[in-house]
Design a protein with these regions (language model features):
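Residues that scaffold, gate, or flank divalent-cation-dependent active/transport sites
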Residues: 30-38, 46-47
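Short gly/pro/ser/thr-enriched loop/turn and capping motifs at secondary-structure boundaries
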Residues: 48-50, 124-128, 203-206
Length: 267
């Protein structure tokens, strides 16, 4: 039903399509499936060739966070149209509810051909939970958290329903305070191919655990002599984490050129 591996160089159409608003979410949503043994390809909106790919997952980075709401919706429409025929269709949503979520969800839903929208923004492993339709970050409503002060993409509401257009019929919001709770809810939903799945990495984990269309063997863990950590976020928590790494004697911190210009003594 979902296609299968033909040989080492050819697959039928991919199994899972992901429409993402930035590169991080394009990779993050793919990761739980990759850990299950599926392969993923992350690409830009155009051109997307489903015929040439040998991956089970196609994740399209729309790079729409920095766009206007209209352009973000247009990018989501284009990406969804390219992936709409795949068995599983997913739309990433930031777990702190930043970005043009309402516009992108409507655009993707209208283009997807799906009859239902399942919206699950919780990512319990990162402290992002959904309780009574309200999104929390470490117990604080997201619109009252530091994410509401994001200079470019502030979280303007904590109420998940505010992000679903009235034009979308059959939408369901999933509350979850733990990953196990989210997994259980996702597992109970039938006909997954009729659903546009919208959410954060927590939803991806649940889908990979309960709805993975093929049972592949997890890949062997990779080993490395050294570890590269790249911090490219403006979030204060990321800055604190980078500062802690910089203070370790075993770590070498290479700063961005602009920061090196401010402080030439730093590497």
């Amino acid at each position: 039903r979902y296609g299968h591996r033909m040989n080492s160089n050819h697959y039928s159409l991919p199994l899972i399509g992901i429409i993402a608003d930035d590169l991080t979410s394009a990779a993050d949503f793919s990761a739980p499936f990759v850990r299950k043994g599926l392969s993923a390809e992350v690409c830009g909106v155009a051109p997307v060739s489903l015929v040439k790919t040998t991956s089970e997952i196609i994740s399209i980075d729309c790079d729409s966070r920095s766009m206007t709401a209209k352009h973000a919706a247009d990018a989501s429409t284009l990406a969804t149209r390219a992936l709409a025929k795949l068995p599983f269709l997913c739309k990433t949503v930031d777990s702190t509810l930043r970005g043009h979520i309402r516009e992108e969800l409507l655009a993707s839903y209208n283009t997807s051909g799906r009859s239902r929208l399942i919206f699950a923004p919780a990512f319990p492993e990162a402290g992002r939970t959904t309780v009574g339709g309200t999104q929390y970050v470490n117990g604080t409503p997201v619109s009252q958290s530091t994410y509401a002060k994001d200079p470019n993409h502030p979280a303007w509401t904590s109420h998940v329903a505010d992000l679903i257009s009235e034009d979308i019929q059959g939408a369901m919001i999933l509350d979850a305070q733990s990953q196990a709770e989210l997994n259980s809810q996702v597992a109970s939903i039938d006909r997954p191919e009729d659903v546009l799945w919208a959410g954060s990495p927590g939803l991806a984990i649940a889908l990979a655990e309960t709805k993975s269309p093929l049972n592949f063997s997890p890949p062997e863990p990779l080993t490395a002599e050294r570890t590269l950590v790249v911090v490219g976020s403006a979030n204060p928590i990321s800055h604190e984490q980078a500062a802690q790494l910089d203070g370790l004697s075993c770590a070498t911190c290479v700063t961005a050129p602009r920061e090196r210009d401010k402080d030439p003594k730093r590497v």
